[in-house]
Amino acid sequence: MANNTIKRRKESTEKYIDALLENNSKLCGVRVDLKYKQEFAKDVSLDTINKDLKRMLDNRRNNKTVFGNNLGYIIKKEVSDNGNPHLHALFLEDGNKVQKAAYKADQIGKYWSEDITKGKGCYENCNRREYKNNGIGMVDYTD
């Protein structure tokens, strides 16, 4: 990917998060990778993952248990070396109401795997792993 594209995406992401922090004193970054179980992954097209993602995002308004405190999201679609599409998702939650990012990531992941993909999906809760510079968890407007 060209350096200009990376720079533009970084600036756009920073602007987006800054805009959310203008109206919210805290954001809780919830990172979850959404994918498909190995036995189904080879049959999943980019069109399928796009439809599943759209359905999940469209359903946010009606699923207050999982998405009631969601303020926004950043999602990166990828296709792995073996051709399996998956999503790297960062859900930005109201940090005054959501403090347990790992718990929220499990809620989102289970919704993806059980309801959206009807048992064909799986997820990885990135909030339960240690990263050097993870960019997840609580962000205060003063940061």
Residue ranges and their predicted role:
Residues 31, 90, 143:
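Short aromatic/hydrophobic contact patches that present stacked aromatics
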